[in-house]
C-alpha cells in the first residue's frame, strides 16, 4: 500500500519563481502593463483590470497557478519602475510583501518595513533619511496567546477563557489571584463576596462546601437577608445571590471551577460577580442630545447607538444587581461636549436625564482653551488640541458626580477613544473601545498622502489617536467581522492599521493584530419600541399620518422639502443619512437619474442634509450643491422628493412603515459603512433593504434572502438590481413579502439590544478578571504608548489650529 509523503509548503517567492520560469512571457506582459502606468499605487481592482487586458491565452495559463493566486490576493501594487511591489493578503489578517524587477524578472521578499520604505519613495523619493521612527507593538504581544484560525477573529473572550482557565486553576498556588480578586470587591466601602475571614484557597473551599451543605437544607426561595449573618460569620458577604437557590447556584459554579475548570463555567461564574455599578461612556464631538439634533453636522447614528445602548445596559445592570441580592443604584453617564451656543437644543445644559431610564444621564463638559470656554461647535476633525484639558475636566466632573471611580469606561469614535484611554490610564479602570468608523479606510490613500488631507482633516492626528487607543484598551467591540478583518477580498478597518506609513512622521510596521483576543463582535440592534414591523397594525402611530403625508406628497416646496411626486401610486425607494461624501446619497440620486426604467417603476425619496439652516460643514455644502445640480441635469422633479433631515425618531419609525405600505425599499448606498444602523432599522420594520457591500451591511444582510448587497462603485449595476426586484414584485407581489419576512427574521435572530447589553457586561467581567489575575494589563506596551503620546500625538494635536470664536 502506497504511503502518503508529507512535503514542505513552498514559500510565496518560491512558487512565484517556479511560475516565472514556466510562464515568463505571459507574466512579463502583465508586469509591463503595470510598469507602463508609471510611478504610483494601483488598487486591487486596477491590477485585475490590467490582467483582464492581456491576451486570453496568456490569462488562462496564469489563472490557475501561483501567479493567479498572488493576483487574486494582491491588495495594492506599488509601481516605481523598474520595480513593482505587491502587498499580498492570502487570507484576512495574513500579509506577505514582495517586489519584482520587471526588466530582470527577479522576485524579492520584503519585510513590512522594507515594503513601507519602498512605498514612501512615491512621496519622498529616495531621500527620506536612514532613520525613521518605526512603531512595532508585536514584541509586547509575542509571549501572549493568540488564535490563528479566522473563525476565532472577533471571538476573543472565548479564546481567552479556553486558554487561561486551565492555566489558572492547575494547582492550589495558582488559586491565590482568584481569591484576591473575589476579596477586592466592594462598593463605597462595603465589602462584597468575601471578607477577611477567608485567608487562603483551602479555607475558601471549606467554607463553600459548608455553605452548600446548609443551603441544600432550606427553602430555595429563602431571601438572602435571612441567612446573611450566618454567612458573614464564615466569611461570605452579599453578592452571591438574592435567594438561597441563586446563592447555591453561584457557590456550586465556583466549586465546579475549582475542581475541574472549563471556559463555560468560568464565564458563567464571572457573569454573577457584582463588578459593574458605574459606567462612563464618552462621545465628545457633535451635538449630543435626545431631541432635534439628528442631521446636525457630525450628529447621526452614533448618538442613536449610544442612547439605545444605555437604555438596554441599565435594564441589564438593574436585573443583575437584583439577582446578586444587592440594593445598589447603578449610574451610567454619557460624557459629551457642552455647547453654550447650541440654540434650540439641550446641548448647553450640563446634566440631562436619558428618556426611558432611571439612572442614566448625559453629562456635558465644555472644551476650554487659554481664553476660557469654547462656545461654538467644532468639527470632529478639529477637536484634537482640546482633548487633553478636556480629559482632566471630565475626571474632575466624574469625581463630583459619582463620588467614586467608574467600573467601566467606554470610548466612542477617535476622540472619545483617546479621552477614554487617558481616563482609564489615570483611574486604573477597565476600558472598552468602539470605533464606529475608522477614517483611514473611508479615505483611500489618506495615510501615504496624508499631507494632502492635513489642512482639512488633520488625519495625522486622528490616525495617531486611533493607533494609541486601540493598543491601550482592554477590549474592543465591533459590530461586524468586516470591521476587524474585512472579507476574503476587502481589508478590514482595524486590519488596515496592521502596517502603514505616514511619510515624514513615522512608519507602523506592526500596529494591530486582528487575531488579538481583545477583539469581540457585539452587534447592536434597533429600538424595538420604535422600529417594529409594519404588519403590527395595532401599534401603528396613525397620529403621524398627516405629517408624513405632508412630507412625502405635498405639492408645496419649501425649506423642508423640494420637488414633488406626481404619481403617488408608485412604490418609493427611500434613503435616510447624513449628507456627506461617504454616505453617497448623491450617488444614489445619480444612479436613479440615469436609469429610465427605474424611474418608470418607482419614486425616489431622500432624507438628508438640513436645508432649513446654513451649513458650516464643508462636505455637506459640497454635497448640497451637487444635489441641486443632479435635480436640474436629470429633470427629477415629479419623481423625486428631497426632504431635510428629520429628527423625530419615533415619527421616522412610522415613516419606514409608510414606505412599506407603498411596497417600496430602503437603499443604503454608502461608499463604506462600518455597521449600518439604518439598515437594521429598515429591516426591523419589514422594509426590503439594498445596502452597500463595503462594511457591516454585508454581514447584516444575507443576499437574496433578507435583502440585497450593492456595490457603490458600480451604480449602474445597483440600479439594475433595483429594477429587477421591482419588476419581479410587479409580476409576483409575494416576492416583496418574502424579502420583507427574511429581513425581519434576520433581525430577531442577530440584532437586538438585549443580546448586546448582556455581552457587554459579560466582557467587562471577563476582561476585568483576566486583567487582575494575569499579565493582560500589558504594562510594557502602556509605557511604550506613554512615550508615543508625549513625543508624537501631543505635538500633532498642538499643530491643529484652535477654533476662532
From Swiss-Prot:
It catalyses: an NDP-alpha-D-glucose + D-fructose = a ribonucleoside 5'-diphosphate + sucrose + H(+). It comes from the Eukaryota. GO terms for biological process: sucrose metabolic process. The keyword Flavoprotein does not apply. Keywords: Glycosyltransferase, Transferase. SUPFAM superfamilies: UDP-Glycosyltransferase/glycogen phosphorylase (SSF53756). Disulfide bonds: none annotated. Belongs to the glycosyltransferase 1 family. Plant sucrose synthase subfamily. Sucrose-cleaving enzyme that provides UDP-glucose and fructose for various metabolic pathways. This is Sucrose synthase. The lineage of its organism: Eukaryota, Viridiplantae, Streptophyta, Embryophyta, Tracheophyta.
